[in-house]
Amino acid sequence: MYKRQGYILISDVVKPNAKEAISGLKAAGVEKVVMLTGDAKKVADAVGSELGVDEVRSELLPGDKVDEVEKLIAAKGEKEKLAFVGDGINDAPVLSRADIGIAMGALGSDAAIEAADIVLMDDDPAKIATAMKISKKTLRIVHQNIVFALVIKFACLALGAVGFVNMWWAIFADVGVMILAVLNATRALSFKE
């Protein structure tokens, strides 16, 4: 008769800061976090509960993940965006289908990296919230530059039409505003969390 000498357990390990990453996403304005996984329902539900995921969809084949993303895309609002984070070769179709595909690059497959819109090279999921904050700051700066340039140019145009400003003001409205916009844009380089 044989006697057991031990067990071998094979499992995926949850990234150490995954829970903090999900909290960071929610703090950054993400309304709903859905986990799509091929894992068994019991395991997926336990991991989802541990991480604070809003919804778990488990036992999915790669094609099923695409179908689930299609359902999520159909259910979202017109101005809402759907982001998908993945690292495996099986995630490539979903990464390319999502509005924003984010690949975890250091351990990610080449197919996932190629299909993604954003690649995080250090596999730290907390960087997703940081990337969102940087993009929001960058968009604010772009909007500021556009409004500033239009206000100055239209003011010089209107004042020039009635004869209050000369050619030097027009040069300032063109070159000076461009230089100020570039200097304003450099603020995006000094991002601090």
Q: What role is predicted for each listed range?
A:
Residues 1-100, 133-136:
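Cytosolic catalytic headpiece
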Residues 29-30, 51, 55, 74-75, ...:
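Membrane-embedded alpha-helical bundles of multi-pass transporters
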